[in-house]
Amino acid sequence: MKKNALILILSFFCTGIIFSEATENIRNFVKGNLAEKTAAVKSATKEDVEELSKRAVDFAIENKEILGKDRELAALAVSGILAVPQTYADGLSEDEKNTLSEEFLNLYNIFEDETVKIAVLNKISKLNISTEKFKAALNEYLSHCNPETENRAVLLASLHTLGNIGDADSFRILMDHAKKTEWQKYLNENEKAMGLLCVKAEKELIEIIERGNVSECRKIFDFVIRNQKDNQIFCAKISESVLSRTIYIYENSGSAGEELISLQIDSFSVLKDLKWTRASGTTISFFDIAVREFESSQMNEKYFCLVIEGIAETSPIECVSKLSSYLSKLNKTMEDEKSSVSEPVVLSLIKTLGAIGDKNAFDSLLAVTYYNYSDTVIAEARESLAKLKW
């Protein structure tokens, strides 16, 4: 009997502690009507915001079927969604984050109110929490919605959120929208979301490049460089893929128009600037193509010099034999006193070989001093010879 009495006393004591620890905002939420509950959530402090946001979301879900399209219930749902603090979400385990995301998806689905939907979308994006179900639901919505009739605010929030949480499927949906006339008024928002997602769609982008024409490759290249300029690895991978495709196009057509040359130079320049030696094989192959294009007057002198000087950045070892061989070829041309070669090209070859300093360039550089080149060229050759490492 005494034992039961002690348990009862302790029970009341613990209950008293619980109620005494409840904040005024929580008590107001429990006692209040919908408007008062919403006011309590909006007045939340650091001590009670987690509890109040959870109570508001749970209450909205539990009573939606009963209260239907009640505006005050929607307002409570919005206040609960917006109140979820970042620190709370950051401290959750993966399973707990999934549970929270599922609750948000439930709110999104059961409430017709656009304000609730927008609040859910913005919060999911801000907290960066999502499940495969949420991504799939958003993908499904954006793939079938009519941009002419859909609520603009909801659509914009959906694009913004998808850009943060989407996947390769999301990118494909948005890329398809970019081609449609009815989506042109959302073009900027659509492209911004695609820009955030394109890294996740690397495989798909490379597949498009590998079968694309010059115009299609140009669009992808420009898009990636514009939207992912700080992601050097991704930009390099796409640039190498584009350069490789331009080589294939040239080899199968035998001619290079201005559009192809421009794309070659731009993609090569990215690899050069990033010193992307992983593309050594591709850039060496491009040098051979550039020689053919230059000698057939398809590539101008300025671009060809850029290729000569840039190849040392992507293929510092492999390029020596290529550059030396080409310089030797020009030297042979000079054996005929009536022949002439491009002095800027010869100077680019000499300077680049000197900068690399590989002793295997000795013979071709020394030969320059024997031919009828200008004093400037001969002086440059002697300077480069002095830089060779033995």
Q: Model segments located where?
A:
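Amphipathic alpha-helical scaffolding segments comprising HEAT/armadillo-like alpha-solenoid repeats
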Residues: 20-28, 49-66, 90-108, 129-145, ...
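Positively charged n-region of N-terminal signal peptides that target proteins for export
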Residues: 1-5
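Structural detector for internal amphipathic alpha-helices that build alpha-solenoid repeat scaffolds
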Residues: 35-49, 69-95, 106-110, 115-130, ...
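Predominantly the C-terminal beta-signal and adjacent terminal strand-loop region
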Residues: 370-376
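A short glycine-/small-residue-rich loop at the edge of a beta-strand within enzyme catalytic domains
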Residues: 298
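Bacterial N-terminal signal peptides
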Residues: 7-16
